[in-house]
Design a protein with these regions (language model features):
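Short acidic, glycine/serine/threonine-rich loops at helix termini
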Residues: 109-110, 145-152, 245-250
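Long, compositionally biased intrinsically disordered regions
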Residues: 1-4, 222, 226-314, 318, ...
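Low-complexity, highly charged intrinsically disordered N-terminal segments
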Residues: 18-79, 278, 284-285, 463-466, ...
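Glycine-rich phosphate/pyrophosphate-binding loops
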Residues: 108-109, 122-145, 375
């Protein structure tokens, strides 16, 4: 399916990865940042020396197993899944965790790339034989930014990026609480009308239609189905509410300390020239559910918390009591989310993208408040799928891969327009021909009336044909230019849609419709998770 894997250093794609970004320097100048992280991801062999820091006692492993095993077996009851879940009970078993919001039809491609990286990394670590590693995907179903996940993006038949939306309202609710109703069926109908019918279309929609109900249920069903042969353990945060009570208590009591640690680390990053990725306000790090919406609470007068718009209020003592009595009323912000994961799981490695890697650089001190160590932060694989239709355009215009990925085609596109506007050849040709016809007419007139009269019809005809040639030439060149500009625009939209990495925009099932269910395993065969560059997979 793929003919080659071209690897581009992130530093060669400055439009996506600025030279002063934490992410880029984490990959290419780790020594500058190693003090902000616990482990060096470059040396997997040394991970075994630190595994004791990430272990869990038997009773905590048992509690974790009881919380997540029935849920996973509901989606996939194979022996391999059971074995992976039961492995979590063993003292020498650790996890490789990653996660993402529950997007519509799994959301953008990079969601799958995170899962792929976790699976492949767990396999790689298992081959070393020092411990057992299980890949875990955290389906962030308590997030409430519905606008981020309520749509599917793809390239339509005209080469434009198109968005189709779920026709339902989020109303501030968590994704966990959003019922799809008829919204998913309508989305399927819209996609069927927009996507071309291929040999794989029926398979695609057969898989998709098995994931109805809640948006989070649909997401987990699809992730479980896509990775059923790779025994990916999936967890939703609501499964861990009871287990999270002690962590929530610490978070509540140390809320001010958490902010102090964050501020100190952020200041230290700023001093050496980095812009922090993680921002926060003085609100509590625990969200509170009120009327089915997540509410951020702010301390008021020392003994009460209120919502930002003051329409809800609760005393400190009542809030402290509800953390224990009603854990379902609480969820975690971006600061606490990894703390929950890495306290409840024996998590030695977290797989993250540019955003996560950057904000983990601010969290090392926060981990210490919870008496945990930050796991190894391992960069997820970053990919562009380069289809044959785009390879043809690339070859025609002699674009380099880096020019395309870094969306540096504007100059070349403008050069084509400039060449057309400066094209004087046909105008000069026509002017020369007309001047020669004028000379011929003058010479014929000197020879007498009979000569000029005999030549006039031919001269007029030639003059007419010269104008016709000029018009045809200019029209065809302009038409060709238009086609060329359209092709370049298609290329840009297909590889860097909306001037962003392809993996952040397009949905996997759009590609599966063209290339079939073997696409995902083929990608997993081709990628190199130990090469920390952007990888471009070329279709055969």
């Amino acid at each position: 399916m793929f003919s080659q894997n071209v690897k581009i250093p992130y530093s060669h794609i400055p439009s996506f990865y600025p030279q002063d970004s934490i992410f880029l320097n984490y990959l290419e100048s780790f020594e500058q940042l190693k003090g902000f992280y616990e482990l060096d991801y470059h040396d997997l062999n040394k991970l075994s020396e630190s595994l004791g820091d990430y272990s869990l006692p038997a009773n905590e492993r048992e509690g974790l197993y009881q919380a997540i095993a029935p849920y996973n077996l509901k989606f996939n009851s194979s022996q391999r899944v059971k074995a992976n879940l039961e492995a979590l009970l063993e003292d020498n078993c650790y996890t490789v965790c990653t996660g993402q919001q529950c997007g519509t039809l799994t959301g953008p491609l990079y969601t799958l790339y995170k899962a792929m990286t976790a699976i492949l990394l767990a396999d790689l670590l298992n081959q070393k034989g020092t411990a057992r590693f299980v890949p875990v995907f955290w389906a962030a179903s308590e997030d409430h930014d519905f606008a981020e996940v309520n749509h599917v993006n793809f390239l339509n038949q005209y080469g434009d990026v198109e968005h189709l939306f779920l026709d339902i309202e989020g109303n501030g609710r968590s994704i966990l609480d959003i019922d799809l109703g008829n919204g998913l069926s309508q989305l399927f109908n819209d996609l069927k009308a927009k996507w071309p019918k291929t040999d794989f279309t029926d398979q695609v929609f057969s898989l998709l239609q098995g994931g109805e109900g809640k948006l989070s249920d649909s997401f987990v069903h699809l992730m479980s189905s896509l990775f059923k042969d790779y025994v990916l353990v999936i967890v939703e945060p609501y499964l861990l509410r009871e287990l999270s009570i002690p962590i929530n208590q610490i978070a509540f009591e140390k809320d001010i300390d958490i902010h102090k640690e964050l501020q100190q680390t952020t200041d230290n990053l700023s001093k050496i020239g980095y812009t922090p990725a993680l921002y926060w306000d003085e609100g509590m790090n625990l969200f509170y559910y009120h009327n089915q919406a997540r509410v951020k609470l702010y301390k008021e007068n020392g003994d009460r918390f209120t919502s930002k718009n003051k329409d809800f209020s609760i005393s400190v003592d009542e809030l402290r009591d509800q953390i224990v009595r009603s854990p379902e009323l609480f969820s975690h912000n971006v600061i606490l989310r990894p703390i929950i994961q890495d306290t409840l799981f024996p998590n030695a490695v977290t797989v993250g993208g540019p955003g996560e890697i950057s904000y983990f650089g601010q969290l090392k001190g926060v981990y210490k408040l919870f008496q945990r160590k930050m796991p190894m932060i391992y960069p997820r694989v970053s990919l562009t799928l380069f289809e044959k239709k785009f390879q043809k355009i690339q070859k025609r215009f002699h674009f380099s891969i880096e020019e395309i990925i870094d969306h540096d085609l504007e100059a070349k596109s403008q050069a084509m327009v400039d060449d057309f506007e400066k094209d004087q050849f046909v105008t000069d040709f026509a002017d020369t021909m007309k001047k020669e016809l004028e000379r011929l007419t003058e010479e014929a007139e000197k020879k007498g009336k009979a000569v000029i009269d005999s030549l006039k019809p031919s001269i007029r005809k030639i003059d007419f044909e010269v104008d016709k040639i000029k018009d045809k030439y200019l029209k065809k060149v302009e038409e060709t230019l238009g086609i060329s500009k359209n092709q370049v625009e298609r290329l840009k939209n297909g590889i860097t849609p909306q001037l962003k990495p392809q993996e952040r925009i397009f949905n996997y099932f759009y590609f599966m419709n063209f290339h079939g269910p073997s696409l995902l395993p083929e990608i997993m065969k081709q990628v190199d998770i130990t090469d920390f560059t952007h990888q471009v997979l070329f279709y055969e």
